[in-house]
């Protein structure tokens, strides 16, 4: 059960998220990215017998760790192995219509990064994997060995925002013609050879952006997020809140745009005196600017550095 201890890293923006969920002791809450249950533990602690918490995660290790962590609250907690994009179905199957709050903490967990065998990290030589759901067949190894040069270029450019995307894609395709790319260190060497030495000397780990791109593509992270926000807002009771923590600008832009669109969905031309499109606001954006970690959290937890919390409230 060693990984249960590993999963106990401090959750990012914990107090800010719990505060913004406005937890009612008898409310129903959903943690769509359960992880090691850092946020969920604090939600469950605040619920009474009438309250309920649904925890969803696609990672088997997370489910095991969270089940252990939330044991003392088991009468009010239901844990489901699934992707949060299927929240509609999960809630329907549990006979739940509306909920009082939903939380998402997007991206890869510290546990996944730190567990070498999961293949998310470029710091340890291991098989290229990066699946958040181990039931999925396709791995990072399959992706780097089968995607066309154009597809690799597109994902590294768009999801990794790497200015050397074209060169990295070219080098990956050339290398795999010799032999399949199997491990993280093999991929690291290919990426390193694609980036000028003087840039490598100053710009952090050369693999960081490419690994992010592969992970996002493999797990369809941005599609899942974009296609789930409206559904989650529809599931909220009046005054219910959706809190989403993101870790890079690609995700944050999606959350900001979807929240804004749900607050003001009107598609009428700006010069129309009255709205005729009939699209009604579903609520309001609570965070005009995202909430970011304070100095204390940044000192305690370096991984919180790029995190942003945005909050939407249903009317």
UniProtKB/Swiss-Prot annotation:
GO cellular component: a single term: cytoplasm
The UniProt catalytic activity note for this protein reads: cytidine(1402) in 16S rRNA + S-adenosyl-L-methionine = N(4)-methylcytidine(1402) in 16S rRNA + S-adenosyl-L-homocysteine + H(+)
- Give the Enzyme Commission number: 2.1.1.199
Task: Report the InterPro entries cross-referenced here.
Answer: RsmH, SAM-dep_MeTrfase_MraW_recog, SAM-dependent_MTases_sf
User: Do you know which Gene3D superfamilies this protein is assigned to?
Assistant: Putative methyltransferase TM0872, insert domain, Vaccinia Virus protein VP39
The record lists S-adenosyl-L-methionine as bound by 37-39, 57, 84, 105, 112
The compartments listed are:
Cytoplasm
Q: Biological process (GO) annotations?
A: rRNA base methylation
UniProt main location, coarse: cytoplasm
Sorted UniProt keywords = Cytoplasm, Methyltransferase, rRNA processing, S-adenosyl-L-methionine, Transferase
Gene Ontology molecular function, alphabetical: rRNA (cytosine-N4-)-methyltransferase activity
What is the top EC class of this enzyme, as a single word? transferase
What function does the entry list? Specifically methylates the N4 position of cytidine in position 1402 (C1402) of 16S rRNA.
Q: Which protein family is it in?
A: Belongs to the methyltransferase superfamily. RsmH family.
Q: Could you tell me what this protein is called?
A: Ribosomal RNA small subunit methyltransferase H
The source organism is Lachnospira eligens (strain ATCC 27750 / DSM 3376 / VPI C15-48 / C15-B4)
